[in-house]
A protein has these predicted regions:
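Hydrophobic/aromatic residues within transmembrane alpha-helices
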Residues: 40, 52, 106, 118, ...
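C-terminal transmembrane-helix exit sites in multi-pass transporters
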Residues: 123-148, 155, 288-307
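Transmembrane alpha-helices of multi-pass small-molecule transport proteins
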Residues: 2-3, 45-98, 149, 195-200, ...
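Hydrophobic/small/kink-forming positions within alpha-helical transmembrane segments
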Residues: 31, 35, 93-97, 101, ...
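Helix-helix packing/entry segments at the starts of transmembrane helices
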Residues: 21, 55, 113-122, 206-224, ...
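Hydrophobic transmembrane alpha-helices of multi-pass small-molecule transport proteins
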Residues: 64, 142-176, 305-324
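Loop-to-transmembrane-helix transition segments
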Residues: 18-26, 74-102, 185-193, 242-262, ...
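Glycine-/small-residue-enriched transmembrane alpha-helix faces in small-molecule transporters
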Residues: 2-55, 165-206, 227, 332-348
Length: 348
């Protein structure tokens, strides 16, 4: 192995490797978080979904503002210009109410193995479209083919939705069956959640590409989302059910929040280094992970459609590969080196 330091010419390649590693770490973190969320999911309990989503979002806001505070005390630029705050805060509200909350609702009907890949259809399509037309990021042939495979995977997994929903509902209410209309609505909800996540990803990348650090970008975004969830919960129930949370749900909620904050920072840092489409496709590996966890741990039915969809997901990610197209490397080579996730944490 060479001990020579990397040259300036290798900077784009290093950015690709860092971004790829962060994207994969985010996938693992979100799989852990989503598994914990699946453990506490309840069908037809919107107020509970609000509370679970609030618990999930709180650590992100806390960590982001803690980093911002320390950076400010050290005299470093901590927050973006107030001119971009409305955009970030709107994305934060959309990500929580349209993303995390809808995702939690879908989990209570579809289960883990189906909700995650269906959500990624929305993420990939919205991220690809907005990345192309808003950020000017090209969608190459391999990425386009990967998108097609992942959409086919989601379609295959969607065919298993009725059986999966019956199993999930039966676990919550003995002998009950899922309403077909509720199943269709849950699929639409998961797709909508993915679109909300896709918009958030483009907003994060659009601002970090302008020199705004990870924590500075996430601080106003996560705060707006947390406040909107809190207000919605108070309007819905009139209370914040901190003391009334069942003891058996507290550890999964803590695990979900902790894993979510790690995954959130990883994906935000990855979006600094690699295009939205590539980051989303790497992070989509959690679809395969969710399928395994859903079947093995939560006893969701391992149908042929589920196995086919998981295989298509793996094929789509394998096609993507780990090398960045030359055109993207060339575009990055003239840019100054940006802050990595490790630097965002270590240099606060």
């Amino acid at each position: 192995l060479s001990t020579l330091p990397p040259t300036a010419d290798d900077a784009p390649g290093r950015a690709v490797r860092v971004g790829t590693a962060l994207g994969l770490c985010s996938a693992v973190g979100y799989t852990v978080a989503n598994s914990a969320l699946r453990d506490v999911s309840r069908p037809d309990d919107f107020a509970w979904s609000l509370w679970v989503t609030l618990c999930k979002s709180a650590p992100v806001a806390t960590a982001a503002w803690a980093i911002v505070a320390v950076r400010a005390l050290r005299g470093r630029k901590a927050l973006p210009s107030f001119a971009v705050w409305p955009r970030l805060m709107a994305a934060g509200v959309l990500a929580q109410l349209g993303g995390n909350l809808m995702f939690q609702e879908a989990l209570g009907v579809l289960g883990l193995a189906l909700t995650v890949p269906v959500t990624f259809t929305g993420i990939i399509l919205s991220g690809a479209a907005l990345g192309r037309f808003v950020l000017g990021e090209p969608v190459g042939l391999r990425q386009g083919a990967s998108i097609v495979l992942l959409i086919a995977a989601t379609a295959s997994l969607g065919m298993a939705a009725p059986d999966a929903a019956d199993a999930v509902i039966a676990q919550a209410v003995a002998g009950a069956n899922a309403d077909p209309a509720a199943v269709a609505f849950a699929v639409a909800t998961a797709l909508a959640a993915g679109c909300a996540y896709g918009v958030m990803g483009v907003v994060i990348r659009g601002n970090t590409a302008q020199g705004v650090g990870v924590a500075g970008t996430l601080a106003p975004l996560s705060l707006a989302g947390f406040l909107s969830l809190s207000a919605f919960l108070l309007l819905k129930t009139g209370e914040i059910p901190l003391t009334s949370t069942p003891p058996e749900a507290r550890l999964p909620l803590l695990l979900a929040g902790t894993a979510n904050v790690v995954a959130f920072f990883c994906i935000a840092a990855a979006l600094q280094r690699i295009p939205v489409v590539r980051s989303n496709l790497l992070n989509a590996s959690q679809a395969a992970m969710a399928g395994v966890v859903g079947v093995v741990w939560f006893r969701e039915p391992p149908t042929l459609w589920l196995l086919t969809g998981t295989a298509l997901t793996i094929a789509g990610l394998a096609l993507l590969g780990l090398r960045r197209p030359r055109s993207i490397r060339a575009r990055l080579s003239g840019r100054p080196r940006e802050e990595t996730f490790a630097e965002a944490v270590e240099t606060v």
